[in-house]
Amino acid sequence: MNTAASIVCLGSWNTRIFTPSWVSEKVFSMSEGESMEIGLNEQQLNLFYKWKGIILLMLDNRLEFRSDNCSHESLSMMELFYQRLSELLPYTPVIGVGFNINLTLTHEEYAGTSICGLIERRNLDIYSNNSQTFSAEKDGAFRSFVIQMNADNVEIRANFHYSDPKKVPTVGTTFSIIEKELKHFLGYEFSLC
């Protein structure tokens, strides 16, 4: 099983604030002597910062923390960075916050879930999009689960979107809630990391 995670904050971000020194000191709280990777997002021509496996990508209307190699440490760090940013920039108009988990399961792993009959592995050579979306609103979040099957694997995307950032659970719990909901939804015991 492969896992990736992200926190997406929609709002009116002043990306000029996000200088390398400000990000390293205020957001990442890096110690002296530590360094971070600075790169260019070629699609949007914006800078991104990467430290300890966490990528901070800034666009005018969206800010994203992303980890492609999910671990309990990276999930906790992303939530902590999101909280710091909320405290550092309290007057930034934020219109929504999304917590996302993307799982990639083998067909054998997917067969062990209680929902495997919802999308069957058939006609994959004919049809390119065998997917199903499930969604509901609960505890201030719009929750959606998307299951997409292809010839190689099964992708499951979980998104918890809060249109009111004040309803986001306390730091350190949001990804735990998503993991618990995914286990319940899939009927499958696993660890995100």
Regions of interest found by a model, annotated:
Residues 1-67:
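N-terminal low-complexity, intrinsically disordered segments
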Residues 16-21, 73-77, 109-111, 166-173:
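Short, conserved charged micro-motifs
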Residues 17, 108-162:
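Aromatic/basic-lined ligand-recognition segments
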Residues 27, 31, 81-89, 182-190:
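Hydrophobic, Leu/Ile/Phe/Ala-enriched alpha-helical segments that form helix-helix packing faces
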Residues 35, 43-45, 118-124, 176-177:
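Karyopherin-beta/Importin-beta family HEAT-repeat alpha-solenoid scaffold
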Residues 55-70, 92-102, 152-163:
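Glycine-rich, often proline-containing surface loops adjacent to acidic residues and nearby aromatics
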Residues 70-129:
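Charged surface patches that recognize polyanionic ligands
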Residues 140-193:
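Mixed-charge, glycine-accented linear interaction segment located at domain edges/termini
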